[in-house]
Amino acid sequence: MTLAKDIASHLLKIQAVYLKPEEPFTWASGIKSPIYTDNRVTLAYPETRTLIENGFVEAIKEAFPEVEVIAGTATAGIPHGAIIADKMDLPFAYIRSKPKDHGAGNQIEGRVAQGQKMVVVEDLISTGGSVLEAVAAAKREGADVLGVVAIFSYQLPKADKNFADAGVKLVTLSNYSELIHLAQEEGYITPEGLDLLKRFKEDQENWQEG
């Protein structure tokens, strides 16, 4: 079993991912979605957590071998980033969604030197907007951001465009396509549900029609 499939299996088993193609969720953006993901749940399961963190370490070594500091996004990327940094014996920092409104007004907490080569850790990629804002903040404060790693991606076309436009490399451990096919294989969804989930990936606005 590949790492992507193994992680997808864990996410389904521990109910970090819910699939309801016939009764969709409503995202904060207002989009009706057949999938809801809460990767914070992974922290409660040592076997899953270890699989993910070891996967991150190997992915970072392969894609970003020159990394000098790990940074987590607040809040979901912080625990994963801290564990990764510990495993790799690297410094750790975290990036706030906005600068503090008191004290020094920091947006990055920790010590990041000018030009230090950074990898940013996120738990989930939907459109990529929030993590790319974190990357921009890190660059403003002098970090040399090599790229982003995440547990899971919805593989939305908008995310592909956003990362391409920003010139930021993205590496994810698992993804939507891997998960939905495994979910059908393992009986979490029907073949009809799989068709709806495939349609959502292609067209988030009109996937329920037809």
Swiss-Prot record:
The keyword Transferase applies. Orotate binds at residue 126. The keyword Repeat does not apply. Keywords: Glycosyltransferase, Magnesium, Pyrimidine biosynthesis, Transferase. CDD domains: PRTases_typeI (cd06223). Its EC number is 2.4.2.10. GO terms for biological process: 'de novo' UMP biosynthetic process; pyrimidine nucleobase biosynthetic process. It catalyses: orotidine 5'-phosphate + diphosphate = orotate + 5-phospho-alpha-D-ribose 1-diphosphate. 5-phospho-alpha-D-ribose 1-diphosphate binds at residues 96, 100, 102, 122-130. GO terms for molecular function: magnesium ion binding; orotate phosphoribosyltransferase activity. InterPro entries: OPRT, Or_phspho_trans_dom, PRibTrfase_dom, PRTase-like. It comes from the Bacteria. Its cofactor is Mg(2+). Pathway: Pyrimidine metabolism; UMP biosynthesis via de novo pathway; UMP from orotate: step 1/2. NCBIfam families: pyrE (TIGR00336). PANTHER family: OROTATE PHOSPHORIBOSYLTRANSFERASE, URIDINE 5'-MONOPHOSPHATE SYNTHASE. Homodimer. This is Orotate phosphoribosyltransferase. It comes from Streptococcus pneumoniae serotype 4 (strain ATCC BAA-334 / TIGR4). The gene is pyrE.
